[in-house]
Amino acid sequence: MPDLRNAYYTLLCSAAQLALCRQACSVADLLAALRRLWSADGHSDAELLQAIDALNREDVPDQVAVGMAGLWLPHSYQVRSQRMLWCLPDGAPTEPFHDEYLSRCWQTTVLNQLLRPRTSLQALAACAQRVPRAQPAGFIFHLSRCGSTLLSGCLSELDEAVVFSESPVLTEVLVDPALGLQEKRAYVQCLIDLKASLFPGRRVVVKWNAWDIFHAQLLRDAYPAVPVVALVRDPVEILASHHAQTGRHMSGDPSLAAVAPVFGMSAASSVLEHRIHVLEALMEAMSALRAVSGPVYLDYRQLHGDSVLRIAGMFGLRCGVQGQQRIAQRMQRNAKLPGVRFEPDGTRKAAVFDAAQAQAITQRLSALHQALIPPAEHAVPTLEVADAY
């Protein structure tokens, strides 16, 4: 086992060995390659698999983890144990959500199916020192179900961008109640640096989870110059969408209780009332962004091809003819299911609530919504760079 442990550590930090192993098309091929690399002819497949499984359960020492920087993607954070999990990337993400991209990484790379290295959270700082400091091109905040997935998907079609759409590892660090604000800020910066280093030549766009807006001040302190877009929508339509498919923050998930008081024990008389409370808190935090980051607000009904191109320009992303064509094609697809053509659903959403429920939502949230909607002519600044190649 000691010899295999050292060989395992060497593999984690060797670009050449990883490239060789990534050529394997099956577990049998990979085990054969590992047997050659590790001079492990005396070990059967079962013995190798058992040894790898045991090593996956151990923390990679911090001094070894440093060598993983620029090769491996930190993808998950285990809050209880404060452990970071890593995998090998598979090209730039274009999926609607980052967890779908991670699924692709595991499905298409046999090595990811066998090797599941984990490190301490503290190892991130040393790892990040091995890669360049990343300055994100832009942040996307949203109230959920506001078109942010469409926007991030369109931007992911640009050759200059890499989009992290609701990255699980970023949000889990932010919601860890055991970490102080300065620790969260430092670890988020380390994670963005490490993730960005895997996609050289591309600028980072982060679409945050809806509840991450409660950490807007922390994120602005870390990245004071990053442009921010904030997406909003008619609250009746937002809540109707959650009625059909409930998001984490609308489900009463106790893991979010430390993020904001509204996620704690609810005294609401109904599920709808609780969700109105949550959306109200999100909208108030969205309004408070004005004092934190000077965002550009955009309503769902103002999101179209031209506004996407203007946001790309605001983020400093060039968009040539091919990029514009890919964006136009993406705009025609369902944001969350790109294989399905988009069908407007405003009428269906309007029919979810009865008149009394719709009135309760409107009375409570309409004024907040109207205050967030920019005039159409000021929805997104017009920047010539959006159309430059």
Language-model features, listed with the residues they occupy:
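Terminal, compositionally biased segments used for targeting/anchoring and flexible tails
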Residues: 1-68
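Short loop-to-helix capping motifs
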Residues: 13-15, 147, 234
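PAPS-dependent sulfotransferase catalytic core
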Residues: 54-190
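Short His-Asn-centered micro-motif
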Residues: 140-144, 165-167, 206-212, 231-233, ...
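Conserved nucleotide-binding/hydrolysis micro-motifs of P-loop NTPases
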Residues: 169, 234-238, 304
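PAPS-dependent sulfotransferase catalytic domain
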Residues: 184-200, 210-213, 240-310
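Conserved phosphate-donor/acceptor-positioning beta-strand/loop module used by diverse small-molecule
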Residues: 219-244
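The conserved 3'-phosphoadenosine-5'-phosphosulfate
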Residues: 288-357
